[in-house]
Amino acid sequence: MVVIRLARGGAKKRPFYQIVVTDSRNARDGRFIERIGFFNPTAQGQAEKLRLDADRFAHWVSQGAQPSERVASLAAQAKKATA
């Protein structure tokens, strides 16, 4: 099954997540089909906290990709911020 989930990057104690489309059998930080955004939970000041390509997100969901709970809430947050 194709899923949309977070892949962790960054340094120890300083997480940075890529929002990726991948097969559910692949490792969390492993191979992915497409990177559609990022999430920086430790962003401060003017730093960008969340970027999500809404068109590509909608495309993959229409193709049957299942977003994780966290990605679904981030997508709703991004949609609310742009509206």
From Swiss-Prot:
Q: Which HAMAP family match?
A: Ribosomal_bS16
What SUPFAM superfamilies would the database entry show? Ribosomal protein S16
Does Transferase appear among the keywords?
no
Q: What is this protein called?
A: Small ribosomal subunit protein bS16
GO MF terms, alphabetically ordered: structural constituent of ribosome
Q: Which GO terms describe its cellular component?
A: cytoplasm; small ribosomal subunit
Q: Which species is listed as the source?
A: Acinetobacter baumannii (strain ATCC 17978 / DSM 105126 / CIP 53.77 / LMG 1025 / NCDC KC755 / 5377)
Which residue spans traverse the membrane?
none
Keyword annotations from UniProtKB, A to Z: Ribonucleoprotein, Ribosomal protein
What is one Gene Ontology biological process annotated in the Swiss-Prot or TrEMBL record? translation
Q: Which family does it belong to?
A: Belongs to the bacterial ribosomal protein bS16 family.
